[in-house]
């Protein structure tokens, strides 16, 4: 077994001062039966813990590290920016530069506002939609996670699903009553809800590729129906591309699936590994935001120069690499092909999903299209798989509800080693 002695001690010390010993619940390795590795450093496709174990990393800081950890150009840009100061609390030219870059990649984002987290982005986008429409209700999809804002912690996936508590204590009934929930990938139920409530719904928010019930792409016609119904009822369609943005394709899910939303939320990659996110969309909606309009939103560190610099450099590096999307998608497909072959050989039912460079697996015999399907996957087999992979120095997300990520830094050798490890791990899963 892998030696996590120092990590165990660090975890015990952390629990004295932080809830669960972590600053985000899933990091505590719930139900995995081992302490979380405490990280010392990371470089490229590898991450090293305080016990000296080095792993091939498919978590990628949960998505941002698309170029790999500590990319030299990104680090150099951050260092140069830090020498000028870490924060100003005032406008800078680089904020306009990143806004222009994002608009170039996402033409549907005519104006945007920088914030510090995906949660801030989704909360602010919903407030803008309510202000723009004058309506109160919103509609989300079961199993889709949009951060920890009160109105969105209703049947959420990801960390909430891991803990078996899709609704959070502390969220008032008054807040929850304005949030409608529809099954992801169910066209008929959504259309019925819109027929009944559409004229009172300010916004429909969706992960166009669900990334918090593991990785679940949309079925044919689902996103098209969302677009048609929201247009019919004057409802704002918000794509939460905090996770799938720049991943499912460089131009996002809206380009891959040819759907133009009214608003988009971005995060993770646009901060280059530092805290940054953004929300934006149609000019007439964004003109409702203060100081131009009456919808208030602000932030001391919004547009922080270090995060914006890291984001600009990350986007420029991605743009400079020919066929960037194709390279990552091919690597991901190769890895999943190897995992599927290993599962078949071990007699383990396995469903593999991929959208660009985000991917996931389900220990299940039937196709996974929504949150209930994801919940039916074999949790015991996942645990056996996860622990075996960790023991072989493969760093995966410690929950069957989390998506995995490929980076440009992953080499053919990394993928070969990971497939080799998967053969042993699938044998362990078969015995679970």
Predicted regions and their residues:
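Conserved N-terminal phosphate-binding loop of PLP-dependent enzymes in the Aspartate aminotransferase
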Residues: 1-432
């Amino acid at each position: 077994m892998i030696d996590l002695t120092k990590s165990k001690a660090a975890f015990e010390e952390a629990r004295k001062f932080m809830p669960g010993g972590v600053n985000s619940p899933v990091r505590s390795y719930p139900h995995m039966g081992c302490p979380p590795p405490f990280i010392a450093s990371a470089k490229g496709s590898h991450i090293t813990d305080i016990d000296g174990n080095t792993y091939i990393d498919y978590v990628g800081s949960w998505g941002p590290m698309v170029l790999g950890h500590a990319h030299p150009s990104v680090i150099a840009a951050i260092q140069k920016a830090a020498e000028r100061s870490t924060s100003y609390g005032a406008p800078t030219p680089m904020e306009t530069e990143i806004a222009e870059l994002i608009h170039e990649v996402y033409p549907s984002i005519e104006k945007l506002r920088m914030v510090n987290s995906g949660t801030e982005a989704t909360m602010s986008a919903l407030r803008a939609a309510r202000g723009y429409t004058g309506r109160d209700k919103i509609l989300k999809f079961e199993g889709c996670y949009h951060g920890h804002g009160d109105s969105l912690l209703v049947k959420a996936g990801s960390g909430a699903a891991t803990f078996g508590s899709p609704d959070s204590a502390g969220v008032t009934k008054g807040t929850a009553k304005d949030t409608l929930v529809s099954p992801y990938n169910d066209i008929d139920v959504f259309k019925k809800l819109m027929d009944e409530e559409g004229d009172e719904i300010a916004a429909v928010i969706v992960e166009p590729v669900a990334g918090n019930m593991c990785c679940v792409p949309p079925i044919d016609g689902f996103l098209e129906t969302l677009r048609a119904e929201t247009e019919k009822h004057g409802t704002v369609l918000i794509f939460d591309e905090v996770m799938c943005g720049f991943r499912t394709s460089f131009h996002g899910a809206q380009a891959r699936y040819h759907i133009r939303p009214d608003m988009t939320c971005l995060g993770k990659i646009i901060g280059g590994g530092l805290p940054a996110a953004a929300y934006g969309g149609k000019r007439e909606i964004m003109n409702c935001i203060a100081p131009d309009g009456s919808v208030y939103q602000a932030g001391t560190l919004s547009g922080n120069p270090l995060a914006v610099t890291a984001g600009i450099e990350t986007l420029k590096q991605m743009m400079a690499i020919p066929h960037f999307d194709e390279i990552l998608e091919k690597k991901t497909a190769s890895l999943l092909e190897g995992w599927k072959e290993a599962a078949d050989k071990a007699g383990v039912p396995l469903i593999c999903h991929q959208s660009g460079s985000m991917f996931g697996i389900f220990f299940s015999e039937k196709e996974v299209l929504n949150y209930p399907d994801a919940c039916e996957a074999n949790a015991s087999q996942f645990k056996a798989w996860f622990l075996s992979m960790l023991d072989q120095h493969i760093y995966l997300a410690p929950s069957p509800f989390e998506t995995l990520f490929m980076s440009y830094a992953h080499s053919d050798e990394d993928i070969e080693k990971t497939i080799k490890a998967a053969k042993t791990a699938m044998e362990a899963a078969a015995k679970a």
